[in-house]
Curated annotation (Swiss-Prot):
Any one Pfam family match given in the protein's UniProt record, by short name: TGT
Family: Belongs to the queuine tRNA-ribosyltransferase family.
Pathway annotation from the record: tRNA modification; tRNA-queuosine biosynthesis
Species this protein is from: Shewanella amazonensis (strain ATCC BAA-1098 / SB2B)
Name of the protein described by the UniProt record: Queuine tRNA-ribosyltransferase
Subunit structure: Homodimer. Within each dimer, one monomer is responsible for RNA recognition and catalysis, while the other monomer binds to the replacement base PreQ1.
Function noted in UniProt: Catalyzes the base-exchange of a guanine (G) residue with the queuine precursor 7-aminomethyl-7-deazaguanine (PreQ1) at position 34 (anticodon wobble position) in tRNAs with GU(N) anticodons (tRNA-Asp, -Asn, -His and -Tyr). Catalysis occurs through a double-displacement mechanism. The nucleophile active site attacks the C1' of nucleotide 34 to detach the guanine base from the RNA, forming a covalent enzyme-RNA intermediate. The proton acceptor active site deprotonates the incoming PreQ1, allowing a nucleophilic attack on the C1' of the ribose to form the product.
Length: 374
């Protein structure tokens, strides 16, 4: 992987990730394909929304279908017929989410399979091995996602263990002679001194890119913004910066303003299946009765397949009838909305008009622009 920094405006960055399987324009949003599919979508449909790269889930793909079946197909690209870049998370967040059915130790995580209750163990080495078999273009280190809230001492212990796991991840990645890229994950909860310690340790190990983890786990937005404002300027300018698991459209805008290059989130796809659709004027809840006889498109400013072919009334009808097509059309639109937002941000950075773009984004939704600290 090669990262090219094309231009900047303030802290915002316009760049490009170059992989053997294709180029990713940044800032970029990665649709989430947890089980090797973006729910309800073919790879061709996902690509048509403007996506350059997808995210796959190491934990779930390890449980089903498993490494053996993956190897028989070649790798995840061949298995799901997506011949462009794929980033896989390490499985740490999913294990963290298991709650009472998992036990975290220095060695790794013991847990019971959420599928059949089988006892399973995952550690840094196993995570690297699984991601190697998936053929991931970007591999994420195995880490512990620090819960929120956490005391300073709790966050420190969690962060320091993640640093030790980061070194083990790096060593195993190198032992496997994996030709792809490995990203470190900065932890430390909402504590700036712990974020500093985490980043310093990761830089000493050395990675191809750096993610900010442990955010969007319940902390106030002000804390997320503060952490990004503190951490992003310290990440080497020639390395991509990835904000994990974020988020709402305004979170992407605020992340870009603070120097983030990559994002992922289930929100556009999950919300689509629940009838919550993102538009240039805010969120539309398509199952509300007021859309029953509305012949207008979902978003007149959107060029997606859904908006150019169907009315709000039709989408309302499909949603009320629980038709699969409704979820698919909603997903196409939401993913295209996110990609159009990223395209707009990239163009604004290139032309030096980011401030105006951000102001228009918030004004169209009747909101004020959040403060950006120097």
């Amino acid at each position: 992987m090669k990262f090219e920094l094309i231009t900047t405006q303030g802290r915002a960055r316009r760049g490009r990730l170059v992989f053997e399987r294709g180029t990713v324009e940044t800032p970029a949003f990665m649709p989430v394909g947890t089980y090797g599919t973006v729910k309800g979508m073919t790879p061709e449909e996902v690509r048509a929304t403007g996506a350059d790269i997808l995210l796959g889930n190491t934990f779930h793909l390890w449980l089903r279908p498993g490494e053996e079946i993956m190897r028989k197909h070649g790798d995840l690209h061949d298995f799901m017929n997506w011949q462009r870049p794929i980033l896989t998370d390490s499985g740490g967040f999913q294990v963290f989410s298991l709650g009472d059915i998992r036990k975290i130790t220095e060695e790794g995580v013991h847990f019971r399979s959420p599928i059949n209750g089988e006892k399973i163990f995952m550690d840094a080495e196993k995570s690297m091995q699984i991601q190697h078999s998936l053929g991931s273009d970007v591999v994420m280190i195995f880490d512990e996602c620090t819960p929120y809230p956490a005391t300073h001492d709790e966050a420190r212990k969690s962060m320091q263990m993640s640093l030790r796991w980061a070194k083990r991840s790096r060593d195993e990645f190198d032992r496997l002679e994996n030709p792809n890229s490995l990203f470190g994950i900065i932890q430390g909860s909402v504590y700036e001194d712990l974020r500093d310690e985490s980043l310093k340790g990761l830089l000493e190990i050395g990675f191809d890119g750096y993610a900010v983890g442990g955010l969007a786990v319940g902390e106030p937005k002000e804390d997320m913004h503060r952490v990004l404002e503190h951490v992003c300027p310290q990440i080497p300018a020639d390395k991509p910066r990835y904000l994990m698991g974020v988020g709402k459209p305004e979170d992407l805008v605020e992340g870009v303003r603070r120097g983030v290059d990559m994002f992922d989130c289930v929100m556009p796809t999950r919300n689509a299946r629940n009838g919550h659709l993102f538009t240039s004027e805010g969120v539309i809840k398509i199952r509300n009765a007021r859309h029953r006889d509305d012949t207008s498109p979902l978003d007149p400013k959107c060029d997606c397949y859904t908006c150019t072919n169907y009315s709000r009334a039709y989408l309302h009808h499909l949603d009320r009838c629980n038709e699969i097509l409704g979820a698919r059309l909603n997903t196409i639109h939401n993913l295209r909305y996110y990609q159009r937002l990223m395209e707009g941000l990239r163009g604004a950075i290139e032309t030096g008009t980011l401030d105006a773009f951000v102001a228009d984004f918030y004004t169209s939704q009747g909101r004020e622009v959040p403060e950006l600290k120097d």
